[in-house]
Amino acid sequence: MKILLVFDFDNTIIDDNSDTWIVQCAPEKKLPLELKDSYKKGFWTEFMGRVFKYLGDEGVREDEMKRAMISMPFTPGMVELLNFIRKNKNKFDCIIISDSNSVFIDWVLEATNFHDVFDKVFTNPAAFDSNGHLTVEKHHTHSCTRCPQNLCKNVVLVEFVGEQLQQGVNYTRIVYIGDGGNDVCPVTFLKKNDIAMPRKGYALQKTLYRMCQNLEPMESSVVSWSSGVEIISYLQFLIKE
């Protein structure tokens, strides 16, 4: 039986936020104040739809956006980690659950030749329309009150594991590798044998630390990391067990 590795994308696989990184394509590399002020909490995807429309209206085209996106640096040790997973695909299934979008993630994985490492990518669907503007839609609708309207990562994870079980695939454990506030929901639903791996110094680690201080219930182990190389060491330990 395999281990399921679940990755966030922004500030986990790549060392930045793809949605804010793309702003460098805007005139003077910044957004107008009224556009920035139009963001409402929980409605990030709708906000990014307006950002992409603004970029398109300003004449920013697909090739320029792609060049910017594939220039994003990987998080330290992440290239080594993804190569390690590729060499051990008989032991791991690997998915991405991300609040970025399908175009950005595809560009990065294609440019770095890491598409084959991931069995599935769950994110907000995006495409260029007939005017050459990038458009983005919600990944799904859900009833979770803890998550943004467009994506509950826990719902996605539970559905994926359930579908795999129906196909006869049962995972020995889940290892969840992430950094952000929207990774808290799936991590708190992990079971006793699972491992939450928050990036050191980021929102997920701070929230889990606070939960621990408040004695809030959490079943999984927590192992923090700052480099993908540390994750390799831990995965090597797991597959030797």
Curated annotation (Swiss-Prot):
GO terms for molecular function: metal ion binding; phosphatase activity; pyridoxal phosphatase activity. Its EC number is 3.1.3.74. It is an enzyme of class 3 (hydrolase). Keywords: Hydrolase, Magnesium, Metal-binding, Pyridoxal phosphate. Pfam families: Put_Phosphatase. The active site is at 8 (nucleophile), 10 (proton donor). Its cofactor is Mg(2+). Belongs to the HAD-like hydrolase superfamily. PHOSPHO family. This is Pyridoxal phosphate phosphatase PHOSPHO2. It comes from Bos taurus.
